[in-house]
Amino acid sequence: FDVAYAFTPPGGGTSEGANDDTSGSTVSMEVAQAIASREWDHTVAAALWACEEEGLLGSAAFVSHLPENQSIKAYMNFDMVSLNYPIVPPPGYGPYDLGIATAGANEDNLSQMNEWVRMVVEDEMSFSDTPQNDIHWASEETCASDHCSFFTNDYATFNFFSAGGDISFWQEWHSGTDNLDFMVTKAGGSDNLGDGFNTLVWTSLNLFIHIDNTDDS
């Protein structure tokens, strides 16, 4: 579940990590648990993908082998999301951001998707930018994670990504030191780390409600 970037991991190769991407798997499972407790208008599938580093093989296979007469209304992707709003970074570090990128839809639908994000962030969750927390969303197509398998096939996607605010994380990226202790330290404690996860779960759940309540156009 690691993110594939266009430079060489400092540790040489890859390693299963807490931020990249056990964090994304954790959020996915928490959201799935919340969604499973209610009835919805649309069928919901939760997935953890294999072989992202080898070329998005798991997600690409899923998209390529959908059952006949089935389609995908929207897809949410969580990749490297530990350090985000409202966690305050240590002194001297850059802001911990909440970033959401939309892709895979026509212009009108992308505008609607971005408006949903704005409504959730500003009106429903009452989040706001601070010097320590940058909140941003935009339509953007980047193939750094499994959402690429979906938006390149014209399925609407929301990609959640929080880089961690500064260059220090990339010293741990794809190495054995990307572990829970490291992430707790960067978050200033386990409670703060939990607050960041709660941001993602509630934001994505509210977005899901907007998606489910619309028709299939």
Language-model features: where?
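Glycine-rich, flexible loop/turn motifs
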Residues: 14, 36, 58, 169, ...
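Generic secondary-structure signature for well-ordered alpha-helical cores
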Residues: 40, 122, 209-213
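Active-site-adjacent mobile loop/cap segments within catalytic or ligand-binding domains
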Residues: 72, 77, 83-95, 99, ...
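Solvent-exposed, polar/charged alpha-helical surfaces in well-ordered, non-transmembrane soluble domains
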Residues: 25-33, 37, 60, 64, ...
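Metal-dependent peptidase/peptidase-like ectodomains
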Residues: 39, 49-153, 157
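Residue-level signal for short, function-critical loop segments
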Residues: 3, 50-52, 163
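Residue-level preference for long, well-ordered alpha-helices that form the structural scaffold
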Residues: 17-20, 24, 51, 105-110, ...
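Catalytic-core environment of secreted peptidases
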Residues: 1-47
